[in-house]
Regions:
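Extreme N-terminal starter segment of soluble prokaryotic enzymes
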Residues: 15-18
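Glycine-rich, positively charged N-terminal anion/phosphate-binding segment
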Residues: 2-8, 23-99
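Short, flexible active-site-proximal loops enriched in glycine and acidic residues
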Residues: 97-107
Length: 108
């Protein structure tokens, strides 16, 4: 697994990127491509359950799929245990090589 960059270069003083927030059942590859074409700078996948990724569920991996043209791209995962989150994070980083991981700890 590669090292994580200490900061995200597209954020910083004087930078205001258009960030596409993840939306369950909406933020798929096609939707993200449309948003990128309309000016989105940074995008993230809809959230995916860590256990589904660990079990190699095809639908879960489809949900975290993205194209090179959609970078910078993040993958959002959620889970019930730190161990499953860590394992899923390693799998996603090794297989998909996202620019960042977004850990969902629950919506308000």
């Amino acid at each position: 697994m590669s090292k994580v960059a200490p900061r995200l270069p597209w954020f910083g003083p004087g930078k205001f990127p258009l960030y596409l927030a993840p939306m369950a059942r909406h933020t798929d590859v096609a939707f993200r491509q449309l948003c990128k074409e309309q000016g989105a700078d940074v995008m993230v996948t809809e959230f995916v359950q860590s256990e589904a990724l660990i079990r190699d569920n095809a639908k879960a991996w489809e949900m975290v799929d993205f194209t090179e043209g959609q970078r910078p791209m993040g993958v959002q995962i959620f889970g019930a245990t730190p161990a499953s989150m860590a394992k899923a994070a390693r799998l996603v980083c090794d297989r998909m090589k996202p620019d960042f991981l977004d850990l969902n700890f629950g919506c308000p």
